[in-house]
Amino acid sequence: NEQINLEVSCKNQDGNFWKSSAIFQTNDKGVVYVAKQAPISGSYKGIDSMGLFWSMTPTDKDSSKNTFLSQITLHLHEVSLSVFLGNKLRIQKTIRRLFVPPDVEKKDIHEQGIVGTLFYPKNTKKSFGIIIIPGSGGKVPDVVSQLIASHGYTVLALTYFKADGLPEKLSLIPLEYFQQAMRWLKKQPQVDGNKIALMGHSRGAELALLLAATFPREMNAVIAYSASNLVYSDFLLEQKSAWTYNNT
């Protein structure tokens, strides 16, 4: 039985180094089970298989460098795991972590009045279909959709304004457009038509909840974060409704 120091380190997309460490007690066979053991001391407490990853902090204490991801990108992420016995490095392994595997397909959609981008994994069985509804910015970052698709989902990043054939502003957007998008997604060969979810944040979350209340039979789940229990107007001085249904 010996004490070892396990360190995890990486360089973020801005080139700044981050690191964590923890001391563990090995068993009679010299093995440490990070998922089953709490560290004796270190950058986190308790049993947590990912503790060394989330507890990393920047080695440079400059406050301008304390954000791990300054922007969402598909940047390849390499993490080094090192085992020290005393002050001696015994073994080191570098893991390459991909945000998105190469088997995720991307297809621009502009048909049946629907505008957006479809993401889906190659060569999979029919999957859960997810429509991601952006907020007031009007755009879903590709990396978010691709990341979800990499877990086996078919994702439609839906555009509903600021595009050809669509309203210029987030004002008087017909809810029927989203109903049409759900019905379109159900018919795609990659999708199990009985498994449709809406996902949105901010104004997109407001809209997802409104659509669930208006068209409950069109979907099976709603993921709404940074949502509101109120339905707000548009952002224009006229204070019109952001959404319409049956032309009202």
Model-derived features with residue positions:
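Glycine-rich nucleophile elbow surrounding the catalytic serine of serine-hydrolase chemistry
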Residues: 200-210
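Ser/Thr-rich low-complexity repeats and stalk/linker segments
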Residues: 7-63
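Short amphipathic alpha-helix adjacent to the substrate-entry channel of hydrolases
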Residues: 141-158
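Short beta-strand element of the alpha/beta-hydrolase
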Residues: 126-135
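Alpha/beta-hydrolase fold nucleophile elbow
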Residues: 190-202
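N-terminal cap/lid segment of alpha/beta-hydrolase-fold proteins
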Residues: 17-18, 26, 76-125
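Hydrolase active-site cap/lid region
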Residues: 209-248
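Alpha/beta-hydrolase active-site loop
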Residues: 169-189, 210
